[in-house]
Amino acid sequence: MASINTESDDYHPIVILIDELKNEDIQLRLNSIKKLQSIAKALGPERTRTELIPYLQDSVLEDEDEVLVVLSEELGNLIEFVGGAEHAVCLLPPLQILAGAEELVVREKAVESLCKIAKEIPTSSFEESFLPLLFSLSKADWFTSRTSACGLFTVSYPRANAEMKKSLRKTFGGLCHDDTPMVKRAAATNLGSFAKQIEKESVKSEILPLFQSLSTDEQDSVRLLGVENCALLGSMLTNEENIQFILPTIKASSLDKSWRVRYMVARLLKELCESMGTEITKTELIGAFVKLLKDTEAEVRTEASLRIADVCSLLTKEMNIKTILPCVKDLVSDSSQHVRAALAQVIMSLAPIYGKEDTLTHLLELFLHLLKDDFPDVRLNIISKLDQVSKVIGIEMLSQSLLPAIVELAEDHQWRVRLAIIDYIPLLASQLGVEFFDEKLGNLCMTWLGDPVFSIREAATNNLKKLTEVFGVDWAKNNIIPKVLSLHSHPNYLYRMTTLFSISTLSTVVGGDVISSSMVPLLAKMVSDKVPNIRFNVAKTFQTIIPLLDSTIVQSRVKPLLVKLHEDTDKDVKFYASQALQLC
C-alpha cells in the first residue's frame, strides 16, 4: 500500500494533517481532506504525484461517503499542485474509481472534477489517458460507472479528432439503449448538452433517433427527461425540422399516461414555446396547454397555471380571450387550493397583456373572487401583486373596485395576510393621495398597532415611518403622532410598548423639534411605569433619540430621567439606563 514519508518533513502542521488522513475520527479526516491543497503545496508537485495521490487512491477511497464527496471535489482543484496541466493525468485514476462509487453525490463531484481536468490537459494526454478512461467507464459492468460516463461526452467531443468523435457518438448511443433505467436517465440528462457540441448533420442522423427512443421509453422517469431535450434540441433546428422531429414528442408527452411526464411539459412550457417559435406555439402548442390546464391531476394544473402569463405574452389579445380566459375562469374555482394559489401568483400579470378595458371587463371580477378565497395563500398572492393592476387600470378604478376587499383583508384572521396588506399600504397611500388615505385607511393603520401578533405591530410602526416619508412631517404631527402617543396610558402594557417602538421608529424621520416637543415629555411620564419591561425600553428608546437631539436638551431634560432610571431596583432597567447615559 502506498504511504507518505513524513520523517523528513519540516512542516509540523502538514505532518499533523497527513496523520489526520488516517485518523479514526471522521471529522479529522474530513478536515484533512478539505486542506488537501495545503498538504500538496507543502509536499511539492513531485511528492504529491508520487506519494500523496497514490496514497489517496489506495487508502482513502474506502472511506465514508461524506469524506469521498469532499475528496472528489478537492482532486479537481489539485491541477496546479501536481505540476500543472501536463501532469494532471495522475489525478485521473482516483477520480475514475470515485466516478463508480455507489453514492450519487460522490459520482457527481467526481464527474465535475474530471470535466475540469479534461479542459486543461494537453491534447496528447487527452487522447492517451482521458478518452480511454471515458470508454472504460462506458463499458464498466456496474451501472454507476456508466452513468458517470454520460456526463463526460460534452466536454470530450470538441477535443476529439474525427475518428474519435465517431466513436464517442456510437458509445453514447449505446448508453442511450442501456438495459438499466438509471443509465438511460443519465444519458437523457446529458443528451441536449452533448447535441450542442455535435455537427448538425450528425444531430439529425444520430442524436434525433436517440432522442425519440428515450422519449418513448417504457420508464416514465426516462420519458420526462426527454421533454427537457425538446427545448434544447428545438433551439438548434429549423421550424420545418421542429415540426417533423420535436413537435410530435411534445404533443405526445402532454398526453402521456404518466402525470409526471405531463407535469414536466407544463413546467417547461415557456422554454418549449420559445424554442418552437411563435407560429408553432399559436398553431400547435396552445391546444396542448389548454389540456394541461384542464388535467385530471392537480399537480399538473398547478404547474400549468404558473405558466399562464408566460404563454399569454406570446399570443394576441384575441387569442388569449378566446382560448386561455375560459380556462382561467374555471381555475379561479378549482377544487385544489394549490391550483388557485398558483393562479393567484400570475393572474395579475395578465393585466398589462389585456390592457385597461379588457382587464376591467374580463379580469377584475376574477381578482375579487380570489381576494375572497378561503385559502390564505391565494389572498396573499393577489395582494402582493396589486401594483401590477393599478398601473393598468389606474388607482381610482382600483380603489373603487378592490379597496373594500383590501380593507376587509386588513382584519384577516391570518396574520400573514394582514402583514402583506401592511407592506402594500405605503405604495397605495402614495397613489391615493393624503385626503383619500385619511378617509379610507387612516384608522386602519392605527388598529394594527394593537394587533396581538408582534410581527404585525412591528410592521405597523415601520408602516407609519414610510407614511411619514410619503405625506411629510406636518401630516404625521397632526394625524399620527397624537394617536400613537395616546397609547402610553393604555392598561395593556403591549400597547404601551408599541408607543415606545413607534417613537424609536418615527424619531428618525420627524426631526428634533417634534422629538423634544412631543416625544420627550411622554417618555418622562413613562419613566415611572409600573412594568420593568416598559421602563428599560424607555431607556433603550432614549438611546435611539439622544443622537437626534440638541445637546442642551439632552443635558437638561433627558439626562435627569436616565439618572432616575439608573437608580431603579430592576437590574435590566439599570443596565440599559447606564448604556444610554454613556451617550449623554
Curated annotation (Swiss-Prot):
The listed locations are: Cytoplasm, Cytosol; Cell membrane
GO biological process terms on file: meiotic sister chromatid cohesion, centromeric; myosin filament assembly; spindle assembly
Q: Which molecular function terms from Gene Ontology are attached?
A: myosin phosphatase activity; protein phosphatase regulator activity; structural molecule activity
Q: What does this protein do?
A: Scaffolding molecule which may coordinate the assembly of the catalytic subunit and a variable regulatory B subunit. Component of the Sca1 complex, a regulator of cell motility, chemotaxis and signal relay. The Sca1 complex is recruited to the plasma membrane in a chemoattractant- and F-actin-dependent manner and is enriched at the leading edge of chemotaxing cells where it regulates F-actin dynamics and signal relay by controlling the activation of rasC and the downstream target of rapamycin complex 2 (TORC2)-Akt/protein kinase B (PKB) pathway.
Q: Which PANTHER family match?
A: PROTEIN PHOSPHATASE 2 (FORMERLY 2A), REGULATORY SUBUNIT A, BETA ISOFORM-RELATED, SERINE/THREONINE-PROTEIN PHOSPHATASE PP2A 65 KDA REGULATORY SUBUNIT
Q: Which family does it belong to?
A: Belongs to the phosphatase 2A regulatory subunit A family.
Q: How does it assemble?
A: Component of the Sca1 complex composed of at least gefA, gefH, scaA, phr, and the protein phosphatase 2A subunits pppA and pho2B.
What this protein is called in its record is Protein phosphatase 2A scaffold subunit
Q: What species does this protein belong to?
A: Dictyostelium discoideum (Social amoeba)
Name of the gene:
pppA
